[in-house]
């Protein structure tokens, strides 16, 4: 017991179609000494930087990479615009409010405090485009996300559960139910979408009718624990989804983290990119955020906030200032000629 080393290796996520090559099981070498195996363990920070080259093209890690959901929605957006042009729909059917000299319309959604209802609608729309415009050839399907193997309710799963794409309203109701019961914030919804796209990229899988509920559930579960100050426990989700067990939730969370390679970091630049891309998605699909006329109270509040930011900016610039002389009253020293005799 004192001179032997034991290692517990967790089982990798089971695959249904292709072998998962990103996660390699640990194989101890009997020829290595204890010094070679114990002192040269890889640090977790080194493991996170393995795919630095691929990270530049991963939208959930790099702020300059385009989000996947926005690119998947472009085809449908172009078709909608084309149909509107062909059918000669008048622009008056879409009621939009525009600011004028007398009235200014603003929405209450900002990057730091997004509107909860419309953020969930945008996230549900992004998930809808992920499912609708997925790879037609079909990629591998992990058992842990298969709703037939791990049902969320005791009701019988229909035999064609993996054939029909869910509607946007169905996805919205599912996400809204979880957010309302767990009292999650709008920021958590954006982080949920970041984790979802990171999972699809890292694990090289597609979200489809057979697995979308459990993938979304795992992303919400992880985002609520990472982002919110008052994290929701797994047993709380079991009270929301009455027929799911705590063991199933624990296994879902464990394998989700494993497939993310334990990379739960969301930089502020990536978060801001997803927020503004969601706004672009909403505008392209006529899902506008609620606009309200600018009131006097809100104008004073915005003025106070801007003045506070301006004062902070001035305080930061003060140590950097250098005194300089004006050229108007510039007096140069005059040298009197010296007589050398």
From Swiss-Prot:
Residues with the Phosphothreonine modification: 30, 37, 67, 75
Originating gene: Ccny
Chief location bin: membrane
One Pfam family hit: Cyclin_N
Chain's role: Positive regulatory subunit of the cyclin-dependent kinase CDK14/PFTK1. Acts as a cell-cycle regulator of Wnt signaling pathway during G2/M phase by recruiting CDK14/PFTK1 to the plasma membrane and promoting phosphorylation of LRP6, leading to the activation of the Wnt signaling pathway. Recruits CDK16 to the plasma membrane. Positive regulatory subunit of the cyclin-dependent kinase CDK16.
Protein name according to UniProt: Cyclin-Y
Extent of the signal sequence: none
Biological processes annotated in GO: cell division; G2/M transition of mitotic cell cycle; positive regulation of autophagy; positive regulation of cyclin-dependent protein serine/threonine kinase activity; regulation of canonical Wnt signaling pathway; Wnt signaling pathway
Topological relation to the membrane, as annotated: Lipid-anchor
Assembly behavior: Found in a complex with CAPRIN2, LRP6 and CDK14 during G2/M stage; CAPRIN2 functions as a scaffold for the complex by binding to CCNY via its N terminus and to CDK14 via its C terminus. Interacts with CDK14. Interacts with CDK16. Interacts with LRP6.
Native source organism of the sequence: Mus musculus (Mouse)
One of the record's GO molecular function terms: protein kinase binding
Organismal lineage: Eukaryota, Metazoa, Chordata, Craniata, Vertebrata
Listed Gene3D superfamilies: Cyclin-like
Residues that bear Phosphoserine: 21, 25, 33, 71, 73, 83, 99-100, 102, 280, 288, 295, 324, 326
Top-level taxon of the source organism: Eukaryota
Domain Cyclin N-terminal residue range list: 143-265
One Gene Ontology cellular component annotation held by this UniProt entry: cyclin-dependent protein kinase holoenzyme complex
Keyword Membrane appears in the UniProt entry: yes
Similarity-based family: Belongs to the cyclin family. Cyclin Y subfamily.
Keyword Kinase: no
S-S bridge residues: none
Residues anchoring lipid (N-myristoyl glycine): 2
Post-translational note: Ubiquitinated; leading to its degradation. Heavily phosphorylated. Phosphorylation at Ser-71 and Ser-73 by CDK14 is enhanced during the G2 and M cell cycle phases, and creates a phosphodegron triggering SCF-dependent ubiquitination.
Subcellular location per the Swiss-Prot or TrEMBL entry: Cell membrane
Tissue spec. comment: Detected in brain, heart, lung, skeletal muscle, ovary, thymus and testis (at protein level).
Matching CDD domains: CYCLIN_CCNY_like
InterPro entries xrefs: Cyclin-like_dom (IPR013763), Cyclin-like_sf (IPR036915), Cyclin_N (IPR006671), Cyclin_Y (IPR012399)
């Amino acid at each position: 017991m004192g001179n032997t080393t034991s290692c517990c290796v967790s089982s990798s996520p089971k695959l249904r179609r292709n072998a998962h090559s990103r996660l390699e099981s640990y194989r101890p070498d009997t020829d290595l000494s204890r010094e070679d195996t114990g002192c040269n363990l890889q640090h977790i920070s080194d493991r996170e930087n393995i795919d630095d080259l691929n990270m530049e093209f991963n939208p959930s890690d790099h702020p300059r990479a385009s989000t996947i959901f926005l690119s998947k929605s472009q085809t449908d957006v172009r078709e909608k615009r084309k149909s509107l042009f062909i059918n000669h729909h008048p622009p008056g059917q879409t009621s939009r409010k525009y600011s004028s000299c007398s009235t200014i319309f603003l929405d209450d959604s900002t990057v730091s405090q997004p509107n909860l209802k419309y953020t969930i609608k945008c996230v549900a729309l992004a998930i809808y485009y992920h499912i609708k415009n997925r790879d037609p050839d079909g990629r591998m399907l992990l058992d842990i996300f298969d709703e037939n193997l791990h049902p969320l309710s005791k009701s019988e799963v229909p035999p064609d559960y993996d054939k029909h794409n869910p509607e946007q309203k169905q996805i919205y109701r599912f996400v809204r139910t979880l957010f309302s019961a767990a009292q999650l914030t709008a920021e958590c919804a954006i982080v949920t979408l970041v984790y979802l796209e990171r999972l699809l990229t890292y694990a090289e899988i597609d979200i489809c009718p057979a697995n979308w509920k459990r993938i979304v559930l795992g992303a919400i579960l992880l985002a609520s624990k990472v982002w919110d100050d008052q994290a929701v426990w797994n047993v709380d989700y079991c009270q929301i989804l009455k027929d799911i067990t705590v063991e199933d939730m624990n296994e879902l969370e464990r394998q989700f983290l494993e497939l993310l390679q334990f990379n739960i970091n969301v930089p502020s630049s990536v978060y801001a990119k997803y927020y503004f891309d969601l706004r672009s998605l909403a505008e392209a699909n006529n899902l506008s955020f609620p606009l309200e006329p600018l009131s006097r109270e809100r104008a004073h509040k915005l003025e106070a906030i801007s003045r506070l930011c301006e004062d902070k900016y001035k305080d930061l610039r003060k140590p950097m200032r250098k005194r300089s002389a004006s050229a108007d009253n510039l007096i140069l020293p005059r040298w009197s000629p010296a007589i050398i005799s």
